[in-house]
């Protein structure tokens, strides 16, 4: 199975999938449009979250970073008057140093990610969407800013006017991702932010055509008229989409076969048929590992119903 993932929402579903499927059968294609260089090192927030999840290092209270990490380097730099745009843990920083040294030595982001997965003892296939630089910028009333500045620096507070995924039209789908699509017919779009997490992946040249030839199931990150977490609602509005499960399904409709939305959502299950897809209700909140596993089992079972 191929899973398209950002750094929030989908990792909880991955937590369930890794309990019910052989790890070597999972290929996670991860958004890299939120990557940025901090203090000379390349930070890949979404990739790191997925790597830490599959290596059982993730801080499950925050669902990012490494559990029980320390912040001595960050604090020392602050003492010396050097401000970093992200609060990086010491062990987390080691990941960034290894990645950056590999890339400076001529290694691709894919190769660096495979190396990190090996160092962490991960059997699943964790891949960046592309080896080319892609960056998401958010146009706000306070000016244009990198997504990390908007979300981490400004806490997602500025009003959003638009979203620009820079470099995506010139980028290529990573070779190993293409190889995965040649071998697997089942694609799951996780409940990550459709605009800034999944959007960059499906905007890569040729990706939509690949998805049209596969069985595609998506899980909604929206319940009612609000996202489960993060700034998806504000970003969807700026892109002209209704903030609802229907709005998410419309965004994916050209390649979507089955759409899973929350059982608490009042949306009409049959209304999705006009988009050319089926819809199924489930508990999508994933408040525990057991709930994640239950949703994973439900979604995996749906693939057998797709022709």
Curated annotation (Swiss-Prot):
Q: Write out the entry's keywords from A to Z.
A: Magnesium, Transferase
* Annotated S-S bridges: none
Q: In which pathway does it act?
A: Cofactor biosynthesis; coenzyme F420 biosynthesis
Residues binding 7,8-didemethyl-8-hydroxy-5-deazariboflavin are 48, 87
* Pfam name, any one: CofD
- The enzyme's main class, written as a single word, is transferase
Matching entries from InterPro entries are given as:
CofD, CofD-like_dom_sf, FbiA/CofD
Question: Which GO BP terms apply?
Answer: F420-0 metabolic process
| SUPFAM superfamilies, alphabetized | CofD-like
The record's section on Gene3D superfamilies has: CofD-like domain, CofD-like domains
**What domain of life is recorded for the organism?**
Archaea
* Keyword Magnesium attributed: yes
EC code? 2.7.8.28
Q: Which GO terms fall under molecular function for this chain's record?
A: LPPG:FO 2-phospho-L-lactate transferase activity; magnesium ion binding
Cofactor(s) recorded for this entry are: Mg(2+)
Catalyzed reactions per annotation: (2S)-lactyl-2-diphospho-5'-guanosine + 7,8-didemethyl-8-hydroxy-5-deazariboflavin = oxidized coenzyme F420-0 + GMP + H(+)
Matches recorded under HAMAP family = CofD
* Subunit comment: Homodimer.
Similarity-based family: Belongs to the CofD family.
Q: What does the function comment of this entry state?
A: Catalyzes the transfer of the 2-phospholactate moiety from (2S)-lactyl-2-diphospho-5'-guanosine to 7,8-didemethyl-8-hydroxy-5-deazariboflavin (FO) with the formation of oxidized coenzyme F420-0 and GMP.
Recorded protein name is 2-phospho-L-lactate transferase
The lineage, from the top, is: Archaea, Methanobacteriati, Methanobacteriota, Stenosarchaea group, Methanomicrobia
> Source gene?
cofD
């Amino acid at each position: 199975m191929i899973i398209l993932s950002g750094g929030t929402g989908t990792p909880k579903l991955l937590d369930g999938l890794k309990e019910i499927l052989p790890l070597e059968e999972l290929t996670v294609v991860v958004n890299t449009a939120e990557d940025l260089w901090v203090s000379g090192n390349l930070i890949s927030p979404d990739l790191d979250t997925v790597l830490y999840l599959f290596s059982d290092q993730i801080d499950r209270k925050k669902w990012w970073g490494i559990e029980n990490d320390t912040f001595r380097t960050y604090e020392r730099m602050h003492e010396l008057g050097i401000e970093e745009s992200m609060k990086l843990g010491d062990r987390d920083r080691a990941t960034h140093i290894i990645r950056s040294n590999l890339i400076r030595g001529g290694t691709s982001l894919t190769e660096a990610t495979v190396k990190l997965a090996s160092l962490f003892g991960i059997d699943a296939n964790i891949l960046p969407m592309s080896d080319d630089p892609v960056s998401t910028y958010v146009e706000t009333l306070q000016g244009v800013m990198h997504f990390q500045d908007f979300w981490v620096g400004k806490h997602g507070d500025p009003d959003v006017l638009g979203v620009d995924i820079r470099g995506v039209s010139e980028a290529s789908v990573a070779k190993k991702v293409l190889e995965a699509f040649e071998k697997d017919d089942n694609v799951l779009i996780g409940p990550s932010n459709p605009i800034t997490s999944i959007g960059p992946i499906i905007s890569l040249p040729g990706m939509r055509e690949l998805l049209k030839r596969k069985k595609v199931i998506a899980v909604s990150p929206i319940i009612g008229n609000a996202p489960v977490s993060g700034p998806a609602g504000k970003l969807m509005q700026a892109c002209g989409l209704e903030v609802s499960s229907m709005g998410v399904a419309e965004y994916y409709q050209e390649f979507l076969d089955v759409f899973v939305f929350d059982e608490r959502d009042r949306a009409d299950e049959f209304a999705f048929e006009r988009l050319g897809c089926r819809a199924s209700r489930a508990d999508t909140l994933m408040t525990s590992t057991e709930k994640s596993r239950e949703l994973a089992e439900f979604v995996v079972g749906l693939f057998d119903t797709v022709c």
